[in-house]
Amino acid sequence: SSERYVIPGGKLWKRKCYANLRFPVGKIHEDQYITYKAFFDCNRVVTVDVSLYFYWVNPNGITKKGFSLQRYDNIEALTEARAFYLNNDKNDLAAKADSMRELFIAMYSIYAREYHIYADVDMQYKMSRMKAGRIIKNQLGYDSWEWHMNKCFPIYIKLHSYLKKICSFFGK
């Protein structure tokens, strides 16, 4: 795929790319707020299709903590990225940022319910379970949809999984 994640990890940067950029204080997903700006100012970006970066899992990092309202910082960052792209006449990138924003709202709607904090979620980030499921399935595919839906509807997904196996067994 020609699309790449725009996070700082796994990339080599010239110092000047970040010379005028600062990570926002008090935000998680802080890289989402500035990395797109660093890429935007680059004259040339080179990619290789080789795994050279190995992610270290911090047992105390945000990916290992439970879901919290702070995760919505990511959506705020995507909203800012969308505005940035629109201001720079990059409508295709604005559309991608908007699509990612919608996907994260969908996923976070599921997680917020699982962690019993949905009542505290800002209204602009609330989404029905059905709409969230549709967005996840359309953007990420069936397997990812099944995994996320298991978080919301564990009994339904188990039944769905059994029916799928039965149909497969009978060749249907």
PLM feature spans:
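Short, charged, amphipathic alpha-helical segments
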Residues: 93-101, 124
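Gram-positive cell-envelope targeting signals
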Residues: 8-9, 27, 39-42, 48, ...
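Membrane-interface aromatic/basic loop that binds lipid-linked glycans or pyrophosphate carriers
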Residues: 116-172
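Donor-binding/catalytic cores of nucleotide-activated saccharide
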Residues: 1-46, 56, 60-69
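Catalytic core of nucleotide-sugar-dependent glycosyltransferases
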Residues: 52-58, 65-91, 110-139
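Amphipathic alpha-helical repeat scaffolds of TPR domains
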Residues: 98-112
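Hydrophobic alpha-helical core bundles mediating ligand binding, dimerization, or RNAP-core interactions
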Residues: 32-35, 78-82, 104-108
